[in-house]
Amino acid sequence: MASSNLIKQLQERGLVAQVTDEEALAERLAQGPIALYCGFDPTADSLHLGHLVPLLCLKRFQQAGHKPVALVGGATGLIGDPSFKAAERKLNTEETVQEWVDKIRKQVAPFLDFDCGENSAIAANNYDWFGNMNVLTFLRDIGKHFSVNQMINKEAVKQRLNREDEGMSITEFSYNLQQGYDWTCLNTHYYVELQIGGSDQRWNITSEIDLTRRLHQNHVLGLTVPLITKADGTKFGKTEGGAVWLDPKKTSPYKFYQFWINTADADVYRFLKFFTFMSIEEINALEEEDKNSGKAPRAQYVLAEQVTRLVHGEEGLQAAKRITECLFSGSLSALSEADFEQLAQDGVPMVEMEKGADLMQALVDSELQPSRGQARKTIASNAITINGEKQSDPEYFFKEEDRLFGRFTLLRRGKKNYCLICWK
C-alpha cells in the first residue's frame, strides 16, 4: 500500500470515519514516513474483534513505510474510559491489569514487525509515565490545560451526566486528561504525529491534539476508523455466547473460523475490505464471480481463511478447517486430541458424564432428546451416530473404544445436531 495515496486507499476500503485535518494529513504523508499510535486499554485479558480494525490499520501504515506505536494502557486501564458507557466500569486491581497488559502486548506483537529497520514497531505502556506521577504534578501540568466547560459538553460525557440514575466520578472524568497526556509523551519520545482510534474515541483524540499543541506547539493529527455494524443494524463481533476474542483460549480457532463462515452475504465483501489485505480489485472480482457462478458464494470461505490465518496463524487455520470438514463429513479420524479440546471449549454443546452411562441417558443429558422414551425412538430410527458410526440399539452402553483419546465421544442426531461427551 503506497504511502502517497494511503488515505485514499483506506477511504476506498471504508476504513476512515473522520480525519481531524485531511488536507494536512495528506501533505504530511507526502513528505515521508510518520510515527503513529493506537491505544489498547486492558479492560479484559484479551483483545476482541472490535480491536481488529484499528490494529490492522497500524499494520497497513507500517506496510506503507510508517512507524507504528502500539500503546497498552497500563495506567488508563486502571481508570476505564467512560465514553458512551451507561455505567461506571468496575475498577480492577493493579495486579490484574498488569497481567492483562502482558497478555495484550503478546497478542499485538504478531501483527506488527518489530525488527524491520527505521519503521520498526514500538510497544509502549502509559504506566511508565503515570506510575510515579503525583497528584500535584497531574493537576498542575495536565489538569490546568483542560476546560471543564468543554469536557462536560462532549457528547460522550453528556449522555452519562443526563442520566438520573448514573453520574460520573472524578476518577472516570480524569480519563480524558490521562489519555491527552499519552500523546504528549509519545510525541516527545517517539515523535508521534498521528493517532488512530475508533470513532467513539473522537472526543478523546481532539483533547489530546489540543494538549499536545499547547505543551509542545506541535501540529498533530487524528484519524478514526468506523465502528463496525452489520447490514441488519446489529452489533458486529458478538455471538450468542458473547464477544469473539482474539485469544484462542477464550474463542477457539474453530469457533473464530465459523464466525466468519456465517457472515451474511450483505456484509461479506465489505468485511473483506475491512479485515483482509486483499486488493479492492481482487475483492470486486470475487464478488463478480460469486454473482455469476450460480453456486453458494465463495467469499465467506475466503474471509474466514484470511482472517483466521491473520489472528491464529497457519496452524490455527488448518485445525479450524480440519474440524469443520470432519464435522461435515462425519469422519473423525483426522482429528487430534487438541482438535477435540477446541470442540469441548466452544465448538459444539458439551456434557460431562460418568463412565458406565448408556446411550439413551447420554442423549437426554446432552439435551439432544427430551426424554428416554423419545431417545429410544430416535435411536431405533437410525438417526444417531457415535463418533461418526450409526447406532440403532436403544440398549447400547458406551464401550472403551467409544472414548477417543480416553476422553471424548461425539454424538450426532440427524445431520447437524452435535454434542461432545467429556468423560470424567
From Swiss-Prot:
It catalyses: tRNA(Tyr) + L-tyrosine + ATP = L-tyrosyl-tRNA(Tyr) + AMP + diphosphate + H(+). PROSITE patterns: AA_TRNA_LIGASE_I, S4. It is found in: Cytoplasm. The modification N6-acetyllysine is found at K144. GO terms for molecular function: ATP binding; RNA binding; tyrosine-tRNA ligase activity. One of its GO terms (biological process) is tyrosyl-tRNA aminoacylation. One of its GO terms (cellular component) is cytosol. ATP binds at K238. Keywords: Acetylation, Aminoacyl-tRNA synthetase, ATP-binding, Cytoplasm, Ligase, Nucleotide-binding, Protein biosynthesis, RNA-binding. It is an enzyme of class 6 (ligase). A motif ('KMSKS' region) lies at residues 235-239. A motif ('HIGH' region) lies at residues 42-51. The keyword Ligase applies. Signal peptide: none annotated. Its main location: cytoplasm. Its EC number is 6.1.1.1. L-tyrosine binds at Y37, Y175, Q179. It comes from the Bacteria. Residues 357-414 form the S4 RNA-binding domain. Catalyzes the attachment of tyrosine to tRNA(Tyr) in a two-step reaction: tyrosine is first activated by ATP to form Tyr-AMP and then transferred to the acceptor end of tRNA(Tyr). NCBIfam families: tyrS. Homodimer. HAMAP family: Tyr_tRNA_synth_type1. Belongs to the class-I aminoacyl-tRNA synthetase family. TyrS type 1 subfamily. This is Tyrosine--tRNA ligase. It comes from Shigella boydii serotype 4 (strain Sb227). The gene is tyrS.
